[in-house]
A protein has these predicted regions:
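Lectin-like carbohydrate-binding module/patch detector with strong preference for beta-trefoil
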Residues: 438-567
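Bacterial N-terminal signal peptides
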Residues: 12-14, 21-34
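Aromatic-lined carbohydrate-binding/catalytic grooves of carbohydrate-active enzymes
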Residues: 75-189
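Structural recognition of the beta-strand scaffold that forms the well-ordered cores
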Residues: 53-59, 88-95, 133-138, 175-180, ...
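N-terminal module-boundary/linker segments of secreted carbohydrate-active enzymes
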Residues: 41-69, 73, 78
């Protein structure tokens, strides 16, 4: 859960201190009142955590601060009774507002005695008794987003509580920690990333030293969303936790406006998450926020779309709804074993955006067993008829490529197909698993190459533009000129030739594996660096369309040099 203040506001918290203090970043004291120094050493060969995307339930998107002990335990019981726990939704996490604003005399967090009269150890034990895991929320700042006691150092500096709180959580039996990023004290705004890194590193070490395996969900990237620092933070969070929120919250439910549509929020979170596949691998997951499928404000078609899209992105599947009130159709969607298996596939690779045109996205995801998942999202308000040729997915263009397909919603299987055909309702998503035959070969890394704009918080079409063989970035239209193959040699191959760096300008030339001008190195930061001159493929600005591209000296997180390629 994110504060609704901007990152700049969050990072200016300490500016009331005179500039003459010249504090860089306050170091938290190691001593903590009332805490003893003995810690169990972590197991010498601890097993990696969250090798598949975490699944479970969290209260926030449905209840916000309106939680109590009974609500948490009722939802935990409902996960078991509905069969969702058996499908993998097995971690129950309490979000913000569970604690008091003040700590006790020993400096420990205190559960709100009105909301949780039996305390957190009781709730954790009850959840464990159901065969589930227990998660809890805290904040890396001085207070949580809802202004309750946080784990971080106070405004103006002082001791933090990361070690003390981690020890307390372990004593309660916590299996999962969500650490938010509101109210982190930073003296100079430019030092924000370093302050966040310090906080999350300290929490990582504190959790490790408890000796208890606790999955660590970080929120730091979300507080730098769309800024140049975003990519730095996305790079280092992988060293500390297993998953991270990297952008806007999903729309929450309100009893005052229960039928308020929420699908636009789902599409937006999908939009900002999809281009970040390069940061993800087993044990490290981008988290576009909660699954609200089946909750008020989501139709059945929209619910299918969210589960399908999150599964194609290998995203965490963390429900946030009143589980006991989910109707049978919603339960059937959320409990669909075939779609969940796509999400939980051990390869853990995010889908490639094969094609984007107004109202439609086509996605391809490789699976560990050699099969593939294919999904088509209908973003429009009209029915959509699709016919997908395997060549469009990167398979061999020679005749004879056939495949078997399973419709993952219906379970229907068809054999020896030459195309995938579907009629897709508005806001719905068709999803299949396909098994190709020998003539298809291995698919190439084929799809759209996109640049995200500097005008976020809008539509999918406005957020990302597509590289075209014209030598410019254009609005995505799904044309052959916007389809690229990133070859094993590092060439960017279009139907009209390979992108080359010639005299400081990109140009299409006949493909030649020996031509260094056609070799591009793709970095984790998103740069396309030409092997002949070590210069970066550059747009006039992140939002520019129709303007000639150039190759220029690579800047640090320069937004008009950051690209998302087929995975």
């Amino acid at each position: 859960m994110l504060s609704k203040f901007s990152a700049a506001t969050l990072l200016s918290t300490g500016l009331s201190i005179p500039a003459s203090c010249r504090l860089i970043i306050l170091l938290a004291a190691l001593s903590v009142v009332g805490f003893h120094a003995g810690h169990a050493a972590p197991p010498p060969a601890a097993q990696p955590l969250a090798l598949t995307p975490p699944m479970g339930w969290n209260d926030w998107a449905h209840y916000q601060c309106g939680i109590n002990e009974q609500i948490i335990l009722d939802n935990a019981s409902a996960l078991v009774k509905t069969g969702l726990a058996a499908r993998g939704y097995s971690t129950v996490t309490i979000d913000d507002c569970w604690m008091l604003k003040d700590r006790d005399a020993a400096g420990n967090l205190q559960a709100d005695p009105v909301r949780f009269p039996h305390g957190m150890k009781y709730v954790a034990d009850a959840v464990h008794h159901l065969g589930l895991k227990f998660g809890i929320y805290e904040d890396s700042g001085s207070t949580t987003c809802a202004e309750f006691a946080g784990s971080g150092w106070p405004k103006g500096g002082g001791s933090d509580h990361f070690i003390q709180d981690a020890s307390l959580f372990a004593s309660w039996g916590v299996d999962y920690l969500k650490l938010d990023g509101c109210n982190v004290y930073v003296y100079f705004a430019s030092e924000g990333p370093a302050a966040y890194r310090k906080a999350y590193d300290e929490e990582h070490v504190a959790l490790k030293n408890t000796g208890r395996p606790i999955v660590f969900s970080e929120s730091a990237p979300a507080y730098f969303e769309f800024s140049p620092e975003w990519y730095d933070v996305l790079t280092w969070v992988r060293n500390f936790g297993q998953l991270w929120r990297e952008g806007d919250d999903i729309a929450t439910y309100s009893a005052k406006t229960p039928d308020q549509p929420r699908f636009a929020s789902v599409l937006w979170n999908y939009a900002y998450n999809l281009p970040l596949g390069r940061f993800q691998k087993p044990g490290n997951w981008n988290d576009p926020d909660f699954i609200i499928a089946g909750d008020p404000g989501m139709s059945l078609a929209e619910s299918r779309s969210q589960l399908a899209l999150w599964s194609m992105m290998s995203a965490p599947l963390i429900l946030s709804s009143d589980v006991g009130k989910l109707n049978p159709d919603a339960l059937a969607i959320l409990g669909n074993r075939r779609v969940i298996a796509i999400d939980q596939d051990p390869l853990g690779q995010m889908a490639t955006l094969v094609e984007r045109k107004p109202g439609m996205d086509l996605l391809l995801k490789p699976l560990k067993d050699g099969d593939y998942a294919v999904a088509v999202l209908n973003r429009s308000e009209a029915p959509l008829e699709v016919i997908i040729d395997p060549v469009a997915l990167g398979f061999a263009s020679a005749s004879g490529c056939t495949f078997d397909a399973e419709n993952l919603w219906s379970g229907e299987r068809t054999f020896t197909l030459t195309t995938l055909n579907a009629d897709i309702a508005p806001h719905d998503t068709a999803i299949w698993s396909i098994h190709t035959h020998t003539a298809c070969g291995e698919p190439t890394r084929t799809g759209a190459i996109v640049m995200t704009t500097d005008k976020p918080h809008g539509s999918i079409d406005g957020y990302a533009h597509c590289l075209a063989a014209t030598g410019a970035v254009e609005e995505c239209a799904g044309t052959p000129e916007q389809t690229w193959t990133f070859t094993e040699e590092g060439a960017l191959d279009s139907a009209q030739g390979c992108l080359s760096a010639v005299d400081g300008k990109p140009a299409l030339k006949p493909c030649s594996g020996a031509d260094a001008q056609q070799h591009w190195n793709y970095t984790l930061s998103g740069n396309l660096v030409n092997a002949s001159n070590n210069l970066c493929l550059t747009n006039a600005s992140p939002s520019a369309t129709g303007q000639p591209l150039t190759v220029q000296a690579c800047g640090h997180n320069q937004l008009n040099q950051i690209w998302s390629l087929p995975n």
